[in-house]
Amino acid sequence: LIAHETSHMWFGDFVTMEWFNDVWTKEVFANYYASQIIEPLFPEVNHSLNFMLDYIPAAYSEDRTAGANPVKQQLENMRDAGLMYGNIIYDKSPVILEMLIKKMGKESFQKGIREYLKTYAYGNATWEGLIGILDKYTNDDLAAWSRVWVNEKGMPEICGVISAVSYTHLR
């Protein structure tokens, strides 16, 4: 809880979302960095496994329901802002951020986050603004990736086709 709330000093206070459509951005960083900040204190713990067990089952469980929402939701007026908070934000968004970091590489991601914090210091930012900055540090199309994982509900379906089969037996 302390690590989560401390993360809000940077993601939520130092850089604040432009509108509640992006409220999830401050929560994703708070959840993610809260899970990461304790790693050096407990090197004997399998933090990757704990992260996976804490977030992935809950994210899949929430995201496969008929009433699932995308992580990024549109908000027409402030009176409904409280409806933006929910399991999809607290459970799925850390999984999305972890995927983004793995896609980019930790070093590239950290460079992008530093630029993001510097660019939007004491101001307002959007998710698209962050993706625009992070895009400079990778060859991947992060905008396309974001459309699928952030703006759509549910988990993307992956289909595969086997075109050739071979078998090798080694002794």
Predicted regions and their residues:
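Hydrophobic alpha-helical and helix-loop surface patches within well-folded domains
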Residues: L1-R171
